Design a protein with these regions (language model features):
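Short, structured coil segments at secondary-structure junctions
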Residues: 67-69, 76-77, 167, 222-224, ...
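The start of beta-strands in P-loop NTPase/AAA+ ATPase cores
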Residues: 14-17, 71, 207
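Short, acidic loop-to-helix structural element flanking the phosphoryl-transfer center
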Residues: 27-45, 158, 185-197
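Short hydrophobic/aromatic-enriched beta-strand-loop microsegments
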Residues: 70-76, 134-135, 226-231
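Conserved acidic, metal-coordinating active-site core of Asp-based
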Residues: 106-208, 214-215
């Protein structure tokens, strides 16, 4: 166990909140400072907020700069996990170079139409995402995944997914991009590691997960309370869970409002309350 984990092991928390970023805590304004402040607000009420994103280690480090209480974070859809004071992040699965080599092999054997971040210029990436030049550069610094812009049919995407599965890779769909990573990796992997770290026999925290897309499903499934945010088309990703809350829209204000409602409503939360399905929508 590293120094940072030893330092935090004694800290008991009632709530562990795992949250996706784009389309959940962040909206099109991409206000990292406000997102950090929203997570800090919950921390002041006894919650540890753990961001879990397709973003890179460098991008997540930038978010932590705006937090008074930096937390662990899960990056690249679960291909990595970083503790606040750890000298190096943990990496899981194949690295990006190996993934790209395998993608080149797939491209040579099939006629799939897509472009990875290695084929998209920084300028085009800025235009697609609205990121600054420095943020776009950070988004390309991948260690365990490769995002791509799918330019083929949904049927071709299914065939692509099958071809990847055969060689131990997977494609996950986020908001704007798909991402290819090792089949063993997902946000739930990082969530499980963080949750185990904070679990104590006398004080087991309640797990809350927030997300809006298919790449959040494993993380949502592990939670005691799942919070769904609408995708860009206004629809909620299909998902079954004993306790589901539906947020009206994304962005730090709505995220914080929803979380405040949940923390108040579920103050007396216990295991027996999971015996029924609950649906709550917050406007």
């Amino acid at each position: 166990m590293d120094n940072d984990q030893r330092h935090t092991k004694h800290f008991a928390t009632k709530w562990l909140v795992f949250t996706d970023l784009d389309g959940t805590l962040l909206d099109d304004r991409y206000d990292l400072r406000a997102a950090g402040e929203a997570m800090d607000t919950l921390h002041e009420h006894g919650c540890i907020c753990v961001p879990a994103s397709s973003k890179t280690h460098l991008e997540m480090m930038e978010l932590n700069k705006f937090r008074k209480f930096p937390s662990p974070y899960i990056f690249e859809n679960g291909a990595g996990l970083c503790w606040p004071s750890a000298p190096e992040p943990e990496h899981f699965g194949r690295d990006t170079d190996e993934i790209c080599d395998l993608l080149d092999h797939i491209r040579g054997a099939h006629d799939f139409h897509y472009r990875t971040f290695r084929h998209i210029s920084d300028v085009e990436l800025q235009a697609i995402t609205g990121l600054s030049a420095s943020a776009a550069a950070s988004a390309k610094e991948r260690t365990g995944s490769m995002p791509l812009l799918w330019e083929d049919s949904p049927q071709a995407l299914e065939s692509f997914s099958e071809a990847l599965s055969f060689i131990g890779l997977q494609v996950v769909q986020g908001g704007r991009f798909c991402a290819v990573l090792d089949k063993s990796c997902n946000k739930g992997l990082g969530m499980r590691k963080v949750a185990e770290h904070f679990m104590r026999p006398e004080a087991k925290p309640i797990l809350v997960s927030c997300g809006d897309a298919k790449n959040d499903l494993e993380m949502l499934a592990l939670a005691d309370i799942a919070v769904l945010f609408p995708s860009t088309n206004g629809q909620y990703v299909p998902f079954n869970h004993p306790v589901v809350h539906y947020a009206a829209t994304s962005g730090h204000e709505h995220w914080l409002q929803t979380m405040r409602h949940i923390l108040g409503i579920e103050e007396s939360f216990s295991e027996h309350s999971l015996d029924r399905t609950e649906r709550h929508t917050y406007e």
